[in-house]
Amino acid sequence: MMSMASTTASPFCPSPMPRGRKCTVRVQAGAAGADASDKSLEIMRKFSEQYARRSNTFFCSEKSVTAVVIKGLADHKDQLGAPLCPCRHYDDKAAEVAQGFWNCPCVPMRERKECHCMLFLTPDNDFAGQDQAITLEEIKDATSKI
């Protein structure tokens, strides 16, 4: 599970953070501490890049945030068969996957461009970077110490 602040307040996002603050990520190991396979990591990396371009959104200026979220999506893809949002707590992950609401891209992202994980940020978001791409090496480097 990851936790971070967003600049848009909504029922799905925490309160806005003041300008100039850095976004941070806290991570807990997934079920049985399993790591994402390279195949799932690459699938989620490509998906994230394509969706960012298609939705005119950008990755966080702090690339480690992007890397951790993509790794979390890949972990869930391996463990659950679907890219369930890794930034939320679930009592029953399998039921959440079946419902589909929090499968990436989640309903709030598709309907209102509100990404709780800060993976897909609108250009006006204080934490939005300039990039819509990230390499597999960047993801592995950023997540290797977690």
From Swiss-Prot:
Q: Which UniProt keywords apply?
A: 4Fe-4S, Chloroplast, Disulfide bond, Iron, Iron-sulfur, Metal-binding, Oxidoreductase, Plastid, Redox-active center, Transit peptide
Q: In UniProt terms, what function does this protein have? A: Catalytic subunit of the ferredoxin-thioredoxin reductase (FTR), which catalyzes the two-electron reduction of thioredoxins by the electrons provided by reduced ferredoxin.
> InterPro entries recorded for this chain?
FTR_bsu, FTR_bsu_sf
Q: Which family does it belong to?
A: Belongs to the ferredoxin thioredoxin reductase beta subunit family.
E.C. numbers:
1.8.7.2
SUPFAM superfamilies for the chain: Ferredoxin thioredoxin reductase (FTR), catalytic beta chain
The first-level EC class reads oxidoreductase
From the UniProt record, list the reaction(s) this protein catalyses.
[thioredoxin]-disulfide + 2 reduced [2Fe-2S]-[ferredoxin] + 2 H(+) = [thioredoxin]-dithiol + 2 oxidized [2Fe-2S]-[ferredoxin]
Q: Which cysteines form disulfides?
A: C87-C117
Q: Identify which cofactors the protein needs according to its UniProt entry.
A: [4Fe-4S] cluster
Record site feature (Increases the nucleophilicity of the active site Cys), residues? H116
Q: Where is the transit peptide?
A: 1-26
Q: Name one GO molecular function term.
A: metal ion binding
Residues at the catalytic site: C87 (nucleophile)
Domain of life from the UniProt record: Eukaryota
Coarse class of the primary localization is plastid
Quaternary data? Heterodimer of subunit A (variable subunit) and subunit B (catalytic subunit). Heterodimeric FTR forms a complex with ferredoxin and thioredoxin.
Q: Which GO terms describe its cellular component?
A: chloroplast
The protein's organism comes out as Oryza sativa subsp. japonica
- Name assigned to this protein: Ferredoxin-thioredoxin reductase catalytic chain, chloroplastic
